[in-house]
């Protein structure tokens, strides 16, 4: 059985999700945790639930969805997974942040691209990647 935990992070009110199964495996989706307090909220939940994050997934790479990528990648030794069309958006993160008047560092962790119709396995469950640009 899959469970979803939602967090609302950063000044943009971005939704971050932790999807986890009965085996305590977790996927972190769009980690928008910007402050240390938000990072602690996320890691405290993961620790309290005794979860093991296995995947960092970005639905897209707008700044509010990737503020926590470096933190999650470093903390849990995970690569960021996203569609290759989002690489240019991620590369422009510092510029986009400056336009909004927020400070952030470029993402420096590993990247793994996901493709249209790719299957992501997660315990007994699997998900099909659907490209929904726009």
Regions found by a protein language model. Give the residues of each.
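Structural motif
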Residues: 25-27, 55, 125
